[in-house]
């Protein structure tokens, strides 16, 4: 039995590897925009969980004996969900809006094991620094935040511009280890079953 990650996110992979798990990488290709449009007006946690579920469900038939994990993160700022900025210009715009403020990073998780299903969202408050314009522009030019929810990373260059977080750090990076542990326990599995042999 293996843990299969329905994502090509380097951050999610690094969380699992750092926690002793060498997952199978099986990126799911889903129409995220269509799901977001279908759920327009829904609660933020419902949206990120639906996106996580779509990813896990897309690949689960190929891994019937394994545990499949899907995840999706978005930043909630001023009542609006912010996904990935995709461009340096959008990154700079996002940072001007969130610098010096607090926002909520919501990560949806969907964990599948055979016919069993565990879905949970985790919420972490992120306090953004009042970064200088020069640093915001330089950060955007690196390309690092372009494919990250909220236009930042906690574990790399973006860490310079985060004053503090309240909640689970692994959730901010892309997958909550406490949520995954609860999912595995709900299936009658132990975390240590997935640790790579040393």
Curated annotation (Swiss-Prot):
Reaction it catalyzes: a ribonucleoside 5'-triphosphate + H2O = a ribonucleoside 5'-phosphate + diphosphate + H(+); a 2'-deoxyribonucleoside 5'-triphosphate + H2O = a 2'-deoxyribonucleoside 5'-phosphate + diphosphate + H(+)
SUPFAM superfamilies assigned: ITPase-like
Gene Ontology annotations for the cellular component aspect, listed alphabetically: cytoplasm
EC number: 3.6.1.9
Metal-binding found in the keyword field: no
GO molecular function per UniProt: nucleoside triphosphate diphosphatase activity
Keyword Endoplasmic reticulum: no
Active site, per annotation: 72
Annotated HAMAP family: Maf
Family, similarity comment: Belongs to the Maf family.
Protein function: Nucleoside triphosphate pyrophosphatase. May have a dual role in cell division arrest and in preventing the incorporation of modified nucleotides into cellular nucleic acids.
Name listed for the protein in its UniProt record: Nucleoside triphosphate pyrophosphatase
Organism: Corynebacterium aurimucosum (strain ATCC 700975 / DSM 44827 / CIP 107346 / CN-1)
Top-level taxonomy: Bacteria, Bacillati, Actinomycetota, Actinomycetes, Mycobacteriales
């Amino acid at each position: 039995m293996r843990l299969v990650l329905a994502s090509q996110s380097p951050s999610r992979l690094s969380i699992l590897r750092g926690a002793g798990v060498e997952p199978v990488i099986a990126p799911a290709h889903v129409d995220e925009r269509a799901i977001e449009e279908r759920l327009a007006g829904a609660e933020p946690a419902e949206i990120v969980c639906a996106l996580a579920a779509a990813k896990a469900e897309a690949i689960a038939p190929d891994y019937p004996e394994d545990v499949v994990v899907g995840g999706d993160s978005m930043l909630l700022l001023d009542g609006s969900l912010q996904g990935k900025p995709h461009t340096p210009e959008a990154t700079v715009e996002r940072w001007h809006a969130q610098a010096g403020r607090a926002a909520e990073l919501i990560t949806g998780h969907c964990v599948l094991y055979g016919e069993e299903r565990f879905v949970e969202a985790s919420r972490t408050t992120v306090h953004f620094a009042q970064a200088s314009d020069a640093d915001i522009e330089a950060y955007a030019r690196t390309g690092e935040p372009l494919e990250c929810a909220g236009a930042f990373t906690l574990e790399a260059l973006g860490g310079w511009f985060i004053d503090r977080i309240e909640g689970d750090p692994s959730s901010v990076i892309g997958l909550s280890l406490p949520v995954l542990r609860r999912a595995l326990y709900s299936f009658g599995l132990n975390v240590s079953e997935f640790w790579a042999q040393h």
